[in-house]
Each structure stands twice: as structure tokens, then as C-alpha cells.
Amino acid sequence: MLFARRLEQLKDLNRIRNFSIIAHIDHGKSTLADRFIQICGGLTEREMSSQVLDSMDIERERGITIKAQCVSLNYTAKDGKTYLLNFIDTPGHVDFSYEVSRSLAACEGAILVVDAAQGVEAQTLAVCYTAIDQSLTVLPVLNKIDLPQAEPERVISEIEDIIGLDAQDAIRVSAKSGLGVNDVLEALVANIPPPKGDVHAPLQALIIDSWFDSYLGVVSLVRIVNGAIRKGDKMRVMSTGRAYEVDQVGIFTPKRTKLDALYAGEVGYVVAGIKEIQGAPVGDTLTLDRNPADKVLPGFQRVKPQVYAGLFPVSSDDFEAFREALAKLSLNDASLFYEPESSEALGFGFRCGFLGMLHMEIIQERLEREYNLDLISTAPTVVYQIVTQKGETLLIDNPSHLPPTPQIKEMYEPIVRANILVPQDYLGPIITLCVERRGVQVSMTYSGRHVSVVYDIPMSEVVSDFFDRLKSVSRGYASLDYNFQRFQIADLVKMDILINSERVDALAVIVHRDSAHSRGKLIAEKMQQLIPRQMFDVAIQAAIGSHIIARQTVKALRKNVTAKCYGGDVTRKRKLLEKQKAGKKRMKQVGHVEIPQEAFMAVFQTDKKK
């Protein structure tokens, strides 16, 4: 009786609902998903764990959703009919917005979950607009209604004023206790439109996500738009033209459940023994080899990395394992960009592109945990546009690739438009923070207790620790959403860090001339604390070109060579001290200083002292 005879073989598309949940971090999205799975009997009581869909350890520890997941559930509504609900989970953090747009492309509707105590947040707003742009039906839901500080009336007016959705009929629920969750499922069946599609048309399936399984090869999560795909069919990947035989199709309930076929309107997985990692790229279209579709489905926008950093294995023996790990991760995470890079200080590694600082942390943590690698990362940097004296335009994502100063005519830095939603009480500190970060105010709109402030801020100022500072000055109430706006001319310089008069290429940074002196001083001070003491003095210098702007010294450890002299002539002591001094000088010429990982990260964490 699997899925009630597959809902009469899914001939009735009117009984399928594909939806996502849109919510800010901590507004209860994963808990609501758990309740849906419980009510629809997807898992038994014993198999339930909190945040079922957050399958990675990192997701549970940090309490955030990183990867889009999918579950197919059977729900018997009050009208007596059984509906198939395909729920695609989405992340809430600003760094993972591309995951959200991918999930929404496979849906007809979305549930907007807003915390009844905290109200609307900037990232929720951004995702909600994406859903509305894609013509999805959005159902507002107020969560955490049982909290003593819940203010449903205020939040309803916020949803109407800020987002512009009619929220008078917003369903009030408590995902934790299960109160009102059935009403959400009923509203979902009643209001979200069924998928359009023709089971008899040639197959068109959109790849929403792919990941690598060491036994099965590439597993693709697909939304069937038209047609059907069965086990044993020969399918073709439309962008590459390669054909593969389908070994297995099925759905997640949330356990992987094999089926004979997937039909139009459904969301499920396909395994076709694809062993090469780029065999089924995300956003591509699958069709059948014998009866192919004419045109490719519109995919997703390719996301451009915003932040670049070098990642290097601590042991050079791990380089090949690191290359394989990156290839497998990039299949699962389409926004991860990487290319080989070598550094004099760190050896061979990769230059990787990320969507933001959280994305970078998560990728490094996943590489270290899932593939047992020890990695060193260099300070993150954004992409700068350089115009040379010859009139050429270059894009530079690595400070060590910057041409010599005489060859540079103009330098441009990327500017982002940041939309910050903040309660009125914290407006002052937020404006101060934005001005500190060289921000220019674009607009300010009051709605209820909240203020929406829009600033144009250099991206290099946003990607370091702007998000953390924003949260701390507003006690966690402010929320941020940003996107790239333009390149703008700026007075930028390359600052080198010298250790014992040797330039360390991996520590170079591009900074604004006005803040170069204070930044150089902070980096030198921080490095002084982090570099262990040696048998000789270690000089740490920050330099712009040949001009030294800051210096700190890590004092040498020294042995008391005069301890064995008891009395006697002072020249005896002096002779021993001179001998020690000469030895130290010789050691300094050949000595090699080990730089710990924390020192590399210090280059961009200097702001945290402010």
C-alpha cells in the first residue's frame, strides 16, 4: 500500500502540492517541518529526532539549515481525500540564498513562517520577494504563539506594511507543542495550486540538487515537470548530451524509498550510476534518450562567489585527497568555486570562492570533518577591478596577483547595497557602525516599531565580521540582507606583512589608504601575540611598497650563559655574552619562523577589537 497505491498512480495532479517554508534563522522552520513529518506519519516516534531534515552535524550544532532537503508526505485532509505533499526545506541565512532560489524553482507555493515575538527580518523579506517574483502563492504563518512575549497583532501589521501580504487570516501556531499545525496543512491543501504538467509529454526534469554517494555515484534530486521516468529508462543530461541508464528512482519520506517510476509534478531522486562528478550539474534538465524534449527548462542564475580565500593542506601529502574532496563538495554546492594555487609560504593548495564568511567557515569545517583534512586558510578577500596604465581591465581576487603600483591607473572596489531591518531603539548604533565601515546612506523607512535602513557599503567591509558586529550592537535584533550593486573607484593600497624582512605572500591584504596605518598596527600587534617566541628576535612589519608603517618584535628566549661565572673579571662575562650574541645573529640569518593558522586569520579579525 505504498503511498495509497501511489495516489491512483498520480493521474490526478490536483492531489499534489509542492511547497517550501520561508523563515529566518531560529523562527522555527525545522521544528514545523518535524511536526509535518509526525502528523503525516513519515517516521515513527522512535525514529524522530529534533531537526530531522538537518542531517549534517554542523547543521544541528549551529542550529541552522545549510542544504536544501526534500520530503514527500501523505496527508489525508478533512475532505477525505489523500494528498501528496512534497516539502522542500530551505536555509535561512543570507549566505545560502542561492539554495533558496533553487528550492523555490521546484514549488508552486511557500509558507512564510514569522516568529510572533521577533517579527519580520530582512532575510525573510528578501526570500519572500524571490518567491513572489517566481509567482508562488505565499501563506503567512505566525509561530511561537504560546510565548508570553508574543505580539501577533503587531507582527500581522508588520507583515502587511513591510512585505505587503494580506496577513489578517495568518494561521497562528506553536510548532513546538503542535498547536495549529493541522490548520496549516489544511490551508496548504486549500490555497496552494497543484502543479501543471503532462504525464504523457516527453520527459523534462529539473535537477534541484546533486550529491556524491560513494556506492551509488551521483544522486540527483529532481522535480519532474512533464513526462515520467522509470527504472531502466535511458536518460540524457541535456547540457552535456551524455546518456545513462536509470538504476533507481524514488522519494524521501524522509527515508530514501525506492519506487518504480516518478511522474509529472513529483519531486524525487534519480540514480543513474554517473561516476564523474560533473555528470549531472545542478539546474540542468534531464530527458529521455528515445523521446527527448525540445527545449531545456529555465535553470537558476549561476551564483558568483563574493569572497575568495586560499585553502592549503597542512601536509603536502594530502593535496590529492583535498582535490577529490573539493570536487565532491562542489557537486553538492554549486556556488563553490576553486582553482589550483601555489604559495611560497604554504605550498600547493586551491583558491576558493565563497558566498560569504559563514559559507567559508562551513565549507572549511565540512572538508575537515567529512574528509579528515587539516587545512590552513588565508585571509579572505573580495574581487577588485584594476585599470592598468595600458587601459586593460583586470579582476583581482588575490592580493599577491596585484600588478606593481606604477602600472596601476585606477582601482575599483565592489559596493553592496545592504538592507538592514532594526527596531527604532537600536538605530543610532547601527548608523554609527555603517559610517565606520565607509557606508553611504541611501534611504530610511519607518514602519511600525521597525526602521528599514539602506546603505551602500564596500563589500570588503561587509564580508569580514560586519554581520557579527551588527548583531552585537543591536543585541541580536537587527537583520541584514545584501547584494552586489556596482564597482566604485577607491584609494586602495596593497599592504604586505614581513616576518624577519621576508614578505609572506599569504598574509598580503588590500586595504583603503585611510585605514592602512591603524589596520597594519593592529595586525602586527595581533601577530606578535600569536607567533611563538624563538631563540632569536622575530620582527613583524606591515609595509606599503617599501614604506614600513608598523612594527612589532617577538622577543627572543635567552639562556643565562653567565650563570656558571662566579665572581672573577667582568670581561669573562662580557666574552660569554658577546659569543651568545654572535650565535643569535647567525641563527637569525638561517632561522625559519613557523606561523600558526590563528595568525593567518588574525589578518581579517583585527576589527573585532574595536
Swiss-Prot record:
Entry's Gene Ontology molecular function annotations: GTP binding; GTPase activity; guanosine tetraphosphate binding; ribosome binding; translation elongation factor activity
NCBIfam families hit by this protein: lepA, small_GTP
tr-type G domain boundaries: 14-196
Function: Required for accurate and efficient protein synthesis under certain stress conditions. May act as a fidelity factor of the translation reaction, by catalyzing a one-codon backward translocation of tRNAs on improperly translocated ribosomes. Back-translocation proceeds from a post-translocation (POST) complex to a pre-translocation (PRE) complex, thus giving elongation factor G a second chance to translocate the tRNAs correctly. Binds to ribosomes in a GTP-dependent manner.
Class of this enzyme: hydrolase
Membrane topology label: Peripheral membrane protein
Binding site for GTP: 26-31, 143-146
Broad class of the protein's primary localization: membrane
Gene3D superfamilies, sorted: 3.30.70.240, Elongation factor 4, C-terminal domain, Elongation Factor G (Translational Gtpase), domain 3, P-loop containing nucleotide triphosphate hydrolases, Translation factors
Name of protein: Elongation factor 4
GO BP, sorted A to Z: positive regulation of translation
Family: Belongs to the TRAFAC class translation factor GTPase superfamily. Classic translation factor GTPase family. LepA subfamily.
A single cellular component GO annotation: plasma membrane
UniProt subcellular location: Cell inner membrane
EC number: 3.6.5.n1
Catalytic activity: GTP + H2O = GDP + phosphate + H(+)
Keywords: Cell inner membrane, Cell membrane, GTP-binding, Hydrolase, Membrane, Nucleotide-binding, Protein biosynthesis
